[in-house]
């Protein structure tokens, strides 16, 4: 996608040296665009855990390049066996992280150490290219849903939660890809953007993305979604996800479950957009089996923004003697999901439908 007319991916190998890794620091958006240069797997791990990069597909791609940097420094078996668990420990909920690392480990184990650095960069690049193609396909399938809702309507109002746009993937995004394509196709779409406390990915990332693309949007507070649904001002909900079980349960940013409940109560279709790499075929019960990341209380008790004089300011918004809990994700049961938008099409959120859509993956896991 483009920033002020310049095309970007969210991660790439530096053109100057052809080995270091460049990312867009998402903690600085929307106020500044900073592109740090990462040269070690430790820097990659920090970028993931501190959320300089976030979004399930992107952290998988970033971790893949972390392995490549490690193999450039030391291609031994010991180094490979050390870097994979180190990177895997950075974020526990998103399955794409583990998927990408396991793919890298399998690919590199087939090469002698002397070939591993080149092979690692090639595999990481392939993961990135495949992500772009996958998200484009997700967008095309989701576009059909939006086009169908647009029949006989002046405008299609879509609510989204958190950020599942191009900055959360290598390009295009998952939940936002159909919206971009609908806008580009001339469909009158308008997006209600949840602020998404406590890290505010809605108003700091999704609103920024949509604005750069020219998509009409309105930022709303997290608790307003149900109100707009009751008033008939939401035609559909599209969100992303960090992990989907084989039975269709969905782990996504905290607050997603409440949106799904409100959508069900008001007859609003609730869709989840995802690449197949986000499906965890090893578990069925999302609530009982998906690990939920607990992040620092400071993300809840403080907030950062731009002061009127242009300076950046972090302030405490919670009384100093109050504690804060900060689960980063919740689980939406499959029964509340109208459909899963994948790169192969749209399917119901249940084990039979997922296995029919991805028989190769389901059989491979069963074996």
Curated annotation (Swiss-Prot):
Any single GO BP term: L-methionine salvage from methylthioadenosine
Active site: 242
Biological or metabolic pathway of the protein: Amino-acid biosynthesis; L-methionine biosynthesis via salvage pathway; L-methionine from S-methyl-5-thio-alpha-D-ribose 1-phosphate: step 1/6
Site (Transition state stabilizer): 162
EC category: isomerase
InterPro entries: IF-2B-related, IF-M1Pi, IF_2B-like_C, Initiation_fac_2B_a/b/d, M1Pi_N, NagB/RpiA_transferase-like
Recorded GO MF terms: S-methyl-5-thioribose-1-phosphate isomerase activity
EC number(s) reported in the record: 5.3.1.23
Keyword vocabulary terms for this entry: Amino-acid biosynthesis, Isomerase, Methionine biosynthesis
Domain of life: Bacteria
Catalytic reaction list: 5-(methylsulfanyl)-alpha-D-ribose 1-phosphate = 5-(methylsulfanyl)-D-ribulose 1-phosphate
Binding positions (substrate): 54-56, 91, 201, 252-253
Leader sequence residues: none
HAMAP family, per the entry: Salvage_MtnA
Function comment: Catalyzes the interconversion of methylthioribose-1-phosphate (MTR-1-P) into methylthioribulose-1-phosphate (MTRu-1-P).
Protein family per UniProt: Belongs to the eIF-2B alpha/beta/delta subunits family. MtnA subfamily.
Protein's name in the database: Methylthioribose-1-phosphate isomerase
